[in-house]
Amino acid sequence: MDEGVNLVFPKKVIDGTAIKRLISRLIDHFGMAHTSHILDQVKTLGFQQATATSISLGIDDLLTIPSKGWLVQDAEQQSLSLEKHHHYGNVHAVEKLRQSIEVWYATSEYLRQEMNPNFRMTDPFNPVHIMSFSGARGNASQVHQLVGMRGLMSDPQGQMIDLPIQSNLREGLSLTEYIISCYGARKGVVDTAVRTSDAGYLTRRLVEVVQHIVVRRTDCGTLRGISVSPRRMPERIFIQTLIGRVLADDIYIGSRCIAIRNQDIGIGLVNRFITFRIQPISIRTPFTCRSTSWICRLCYGRSPTHGDLVELGEAVGIIAGQSIGEPGTQLTLRTFHTGGVFTGGTAEHVRAPSNGKIKFNFNEALVHPARTRHGHPALLCSMDLDVTIESEDILHNLTIPPKSFLLVQNNQYVESEQVIAEICAGTSTFHFKERVRKHIYSDSEGEMHWSTDVYHAPEFTYSNVHLLPKTSHLWILSGGSCRSRGAPFSLHKDQDQMNPRSTERERRYLSSLSANNDQIRYKFFSSSFSGKKKDDRSPGYSEMNRIICTLPCNLIYPSILRENSDLLAKRRRNRLVIPVQSSQEREKELIPHSGISIELPINGIFRKKSILAFFDDPRYRTKSSGITQYETMGMHSIVKKEGLVDYRGINEFKPKYQMTIDRFFFIPEEVHILPESSSIMVRNNSLIGVDTRIALNTRSRAGGLVRVERKKRGIALQIFSGTIHFPGETDKISWDSGILIPPGTGKRNSKESKKWKNGIYVQRITPTKKKHFVLFRPVVTYEIADGLNLARLFPPDLCQEKDNMQLQIVNYIVYGNGKPIREISDTSIQLVRTWFILNWDQGKKSASAEAAHASFVEVRAKGLIRDFLRIDLVKSPILDPRKRNDPSGSGLISDNVSDHTNINPFYSKPKMKQSPRQNHGTIRTLLNQNKECPSLMILSASNCFRMGPFNDVKSQNVIKESIKKDAIIQIRNSIGPLGTALQVVNFDSFYYFITHNQVLLTKYLQVENLKQTFQVLQYYLMDESGRIYNPDPRSNIVLNSFNLSWYFLPHNNYENSCEEISTIVSLGQFICENGCIAKNGPYLRSGQVLIVRLDSVVIRSAKPYLATPGATVHGHYGEILYDGDTVVTFLYEKSRSGDITQGLPKVEQVLEVRSVDSISVNLEKRVENWNEHITRILGFPWGFLIGAELTIVQSRISLVNKIQKVYRSQGVQIHNRHIEIIVRQITSKVLVSEDGMSNVFLPRELIGLLRAERTGRALEESICYKAFLLGITRTSLNTQSFISEASFQETARVLAKAALRGRIDWLKGLKENVVIGGMIPVGTGFKGLVHCSKQHKSIPKNKHFFEGEIRDILFHHRELFDSCISKNFHDTPEQSFRVFNDS
């Protein structure tokens, strides 16, 4: 350099990138030798300055970032909020995990970005800062772990551990953080060891594929090129792609040529291209070279070492293999501290440019509601959405890209920098996604419910795997489980109350039944109505009865079992219908079957004179409308008795009429209720015949007199059958409105008396003021037998009195005297119903019995199911305090040895030292997969809690007054939701006192002295739909967990947490935690409403699990799940760790052409379409050739992009031509297909594409083939040299095959010459090689003909070709190519 030149003195920090640029400029200007001399001087200068500075590195140089404290605190706050939402059931586990990762990843990234400015401002000459940011040693992420935070770690499987390490290595780690850090560090160490060997093996395989690729020619004469457009890629990548390449075509600007074909591209030419914005530029690449087993200089381009065209004889294949493999080795060794640290991508956000109101087109075709990846409600854009933000003085227009989430509502006010949309992650990041299954396990045992429909997955039709069609909650209702393994049936039934330890005693009972059966009160009766002997019985059933009869003080009635097992009693939840047939019915078989319906109340409690069952006699049924009459008016006697009213399962008496006479009369008539708008085709008081049209769609069933009346709801049209009589002066008939003349009261010999032998009903009709006539209507007489034969309906055992139990029979006319009866849609009307009333005397045994508890007991034996009705007299402990702890009370299982379970858990024996909540509960029988051993679930007090009281004087007074007004209104018992636990005995007592209130709580429980404090509570009033209105939303909530203590909430605790709304609580409703039931108190737990009272609700605690569509639910509805069982499985996408140790397997997958999850089928379909159309247009020889060409070009570009993506994401720059040489080898084969059989090649034989083309031209016939991708390993074993193949793998097999086939090795590559010790045909050894073949000179015509045709097809129709090819070149398409597995 001349010393006299005025040198510029730039004051800039020179980093690694600047040094690279400087060196390349120096080489361009001064050449290699002078540049190396300059660089030696730079090196010496650097060492001198470093020695003079004497930088040392100490622990004090690690400066923690000041903003770290509040950043971490903010992230913790978000994590806590997220945990709450997950607990409430607002987000599911995957959304929580995903958001947690992104919160901590964003915090860690922000700290990393803060690090450099912090060093620059506080300490620019910090040794750590100088070392890492100059690129000498360590990078930003490594220093970030020293002074920022260590962040999220990966476990050895590459999965993320969701507990972040908040400390950095300068501060030191806590014990937990250290253990998590060890996971990641272990992964880093293992990766360094394992992946290094992997990288080395990858390099060996790559070199094996391309070791024979040598530059042996200057120009192959190809006319093809690949288009590169500056508009389709970033400028930096465009420059990297073009520099060092050779143009395949002339470049024009207008009519002026600025570059010619076969000219190599330097930096000046690239800048000119960028300046002039040239249209797509066609360049030569290794893909376009027409040489079979080598490459020409122009297709390769410049040598990266000296910046000129590559020399002949250069081993570019080995250089390419080393260039790709070596960075992997280097990067695995360069892990430093970052081993195992998780890196992922966060979503991009669109922010509002200013304050204002946001507006967009709210159209269902454009946006629809959805959930974001974090479970937040949002609007999903299906296509580009234009958004306008109106501020005071300016309008901002934004475009939201498709598949983005809009986080604001239409016309909402947004603030500046507020996030208004989230762009779908993955469109702009290089991180790999993988589909992962996430199993969610139950953390408590309980019963499974779901709040939506599910359907079977097609592959699991007969199992318990279901798919969710929409977002919903899964609920695990709490309850302790106990499995009965001892016997195939259990004595416990649904809703029984039990002690959990009693199941053990049950097994002892079953095994040690005493043989002394005489002491057991036991009877067994014939299972049919016919008079069989009592001895004719099944031994299996007697054994069953014995077991059940061992329970003291219980009445057990066997149900009626027919000889035909098809007519077993139909059992519903709380109802048993016993089929009944009289002997007459058996003979005639005309009357339809009827049955005795035994219906138990929901809680199973009967008070005195309650209705146990009813029987509808088919003789008292009619199918027509009409009027009932008891004799002539005033002539019948009626005795007032206690009638009945049906409430929610409790039937009790109220004053009604009970018949004491032996017959009643029914006057039939036909009634039609028509709407007001209908047109009536008959007149009032006219006579019609049978099947006369009376309205548009209505015809009469009987003839007679028509009466038309207008009513509120429409038009009532009555048809009275009978005869019309015009009375003369001699007829003495009373002018009352209607008279019933019983049979036998008229004139004996008259025609009318013979005609109306059943009696007549006389009715006076006055159509006009003057005329009148009398209508004689026929009457149906019903005779009532003298009492019902009980033996015909029940077994004899049921008719006998036991323990002062009585069964009374009452016939009850359903309709009152003279009341009209209307039929409803062809259903039969029951006129008389027979009631069976349960009663008992106030004898010695049952003096204090206020109620009876009834339940159905189902016993299975020998494949038959038998239902028993069990009735227990319940003794009220309040009315008889001396017998409160009497062990002989009515329990499920009791003996003298073990302690006894009373009906009410709060009156246990003083000896019991455990608290009642652990010992007592209501039993629930649940579905189990093993049908022989049913599972039992015990619902005890610890699984439920009470919320209340909701105190408001006004609303309570209103309800009290309404109860006073109508004394009939009973307190309704709680109805169960969806077949779940209908009643919890601990709260819903078995006792009904005079006030109809109940014992709720024992205030004190002492072992020596048992004291009870009772609180009288009332219920809500419920309407028919089962909904309950909460009258006071402003009151407090008290949580009573039934562990004998109260929890009070202060009145002003939640002042503004809930709005003033009236909450409607319905039974069976699921309530999420933190929902509002009262103004100043949210729900304290999630659960299901079991009981609703006036001032409180009882909720069975439950755990909600949110599940989104496509999740897989394990288990059936109502099934017991144990702790640790799988509840639901999610399928979701997650980012892989972005470490090169994770990237290398990805490169290997692509190069070995193994199938990857993300490969799509789009390209494959497109290629098939091309093949079809091109073959149809051009005929077979050209069709296969061009179809295979297009497929191979597409797959090559896609492969190059995939491999570059991995390395660029790590900051590693590899020139495209190295990758192209490798990819060219693995895509150079085609597969001969079977449909076009050729004499030359075998079906499914692998041949080179160029060989296939030449053979086709020579034979002038079509060879059918398709493109095929080989992995690098299979390519190494499919070369022309068997010596090279044998030196790589499977030596014995390869040599044996080669010997048998008589293969010849032409020793063209490096490896085979090394093996046999010959001269390597590279470098100086290349000059002695003859590379001109006579064969090429012998067919010049065919060659020119073929090339001309290709040029015409591919370049004169350039629009088609360029649009297909250039679109995919050097961008990052998601779609890939069809791959063929090695197998």
Swiss-Prot record:
SUPFAM superfamilies from the UniProt entry:
beta and beta-prime subunits of DNA dependent RNA-polymerase
The molecular function terms of the Gene Ontology recorded here are: DNA binding; DNA-directed RNA polymerase activity; zinc ion binding
Where Zn(2+) binds, per the record, is at 220, 289, 296, 299
Please verify whether the record's keywords include Transcription.
yes
Q: What is its EC number?
A: 2.7.7.6
Indicate the principal place this protein occupies in or around the cell.
Answer: plastid
Q: What cofactor(s) does the depicted protein rely on?
A: Zn(2+)
Gene3D superfamilies, alphabetically?
A: 1.10.132.30, 1.10.150.390, 1.10.1790.20, RNA polymerase Rpb1, domain 3
Query: What's the family?
Result: Belongs to the RNA polymerase beta' chain family. RpoC2 subfamily.
Q: What does this protein do?
A: DNA-dependent RNA polymerase catalyzes the transcription of DNA into RNA using the four ribonucleoside triphosphates as substrates.
NCBIfam families tied to this protein: rpoC2_cyan
| UniProt protein name | DNA-directed RNA polymerase subunit beta''
